[in-house]
């Protein structure tokens, strides 16, 4: 009985995320993401217009979402891997 209880505790610890962590995409590839540091609990996707048909996209974690401008479109979100 003790072995079963210990096994359940270990499985619970392994399967559950014991701390709050946000996971955000940080590359254009959909399967590559990083765990955000403490305090950065939002995901961001910034599209920077360089030339009429060329764009840079930056993805990652952020604490405060900046405002968009004429040359930069900013999208912030609050769920895991939401910055596609």
Swiss-Prot record:
Domain of life of the native organism: Eukaryota
Protein's UniProt keywords contain Acetylation: no
Main location: secreted
Disulphides: 24-43, 36-61, 65-76, 77-82
Keywords noted in UniProt: Cardiotoxin, Disulfide bond, G-protein coupled receptor impairing toxin, Secreted, Signal, Toxin
Position of the signal peptide: 1-21
GO molecular function per UniProt: toxin activity
Localization: Secreted
GO cellular component assignments: extracellular region
Tissue expression: Expressed by the venom gland.
PROSITE patterns: SNAKE_TOXIN
Family membership noted in the UniProt record: Belongs to the three-finger toxin family. Short-chain subfamily. Aminergic toxin sub-subfamily.
Something else known: Negative results: does not affect blood coagulation and does not show significant hemolytic activity.
The name this protein goes by in its record: Beta-cardiotoxin CTX9
Native source species: Ophiophagus hannah
């Amino acid at each position: 009985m003790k072995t079963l209880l210990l096994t359940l505790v270990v499985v619970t610890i392994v399967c559950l995320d014991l701390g709050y962590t946000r996971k955000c995409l940080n590359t254009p590839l959909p399967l590559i993401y990083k765990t955000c540091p403490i305090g950065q609990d939002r995901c961001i996707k910034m599209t920077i217009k360089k030339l009429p048909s060329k764009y840079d996209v930056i993805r990652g974690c952020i604490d405060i979402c900046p405002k968009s401008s004429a040359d930069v479109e900013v999208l912030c979100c609050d769920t895991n891997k939401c910055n596609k």
